């Protein structure tokens, strides 16, 4: 039984899931929106929201916690200086997931995840 086992495996091992989450979070925070599968978007949402909430702390410790997951210095700078202040008054709910149809090759549901 898998009681209490949150999260999805996404048909990957642990390190590949971490790499996927970091890469997609970096792309989302850099571009503001990305298109991916619905399942990956649902896994990405809490990861990015926790990063933004951490960045709202605004101090050096918060910057280092963000840099631990986002390995692009420009994106870390953008999160700390632009994204976090934008959501200073907002208590969560920084992202939106929109379904955009199915992928032609395998019929999987695609989604657009964007910063609100």
From Swiss-Prot:
Give the intrachain disulfide bonds.
Answer: none
Name the Gene Ontology molecular function terms of this record.
structural constituent of ribosome
Q: Does the keyword Transmembrane helix apply?
A: no
* Gene Ontology biological process terms in this record: translation
Q: Which SUPFAM superfamilies match?
A: Prokaryotic ribosomal protein L17
Q: Would you tell me the Gene Ontology cellular component terms?
A: cytosolic large ribosomal subunit
Keywords (alphabetical) are: Ribonucleoprotein, Ribosomal protein
Q: Which Pfam families match?
A: Ribosomal_L17
Is the keyword Ubl conjugation in the record? Answer: no
Judging by the UniProt lineage, the source's domain of life is Bacteria
Gene3D superfamilies to which the protein is assigned, alphabetical = Ribosomal protein L17 (3.90.1030.10)
Checking NCBIfam families in the record gives: L17
Record's subunit section:
Part of the 50S ribosomal subunit. Contacts protein L32.
Q: Which family is annotated?
A: Belongs to the bacterial ribosomal protein bL17 family.
Indicate what this protein is called per its UniProt record. Answer: Large ribosomal subunit protein bL17
Q: Please name the source species.
A: Deinococcus geothermalis (strain DSM 11300 / CIP 105573 / AG-3a)
Instruction: Write the gene name.
Output: rplQ
């Amino acid at each position: 039984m898998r009681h209490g086992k949150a999260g999805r495996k996404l048909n990957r091992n642990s390190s590949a899931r971490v790499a996927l989450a970091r890469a997609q979070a970096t792309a989302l925070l850099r571009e503001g929106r990305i298109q991916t599968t619905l399942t990956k978007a649902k896994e990405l949402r809490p990861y990015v929201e926790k990063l933004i909430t951490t960045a709202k702390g605004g101090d050096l410790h918060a910057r280092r916690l963000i840099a631990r997951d986002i390995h692009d210095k420009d994106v870390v700078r953008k999160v700390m200086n632009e994204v976090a202040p934008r959501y200073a008054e907002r208590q969560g709910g920084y992202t939106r997931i929109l379904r955009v149809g199915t992928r032609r090759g395998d019929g999987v549901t695609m989604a657009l995840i964007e910063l609100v």
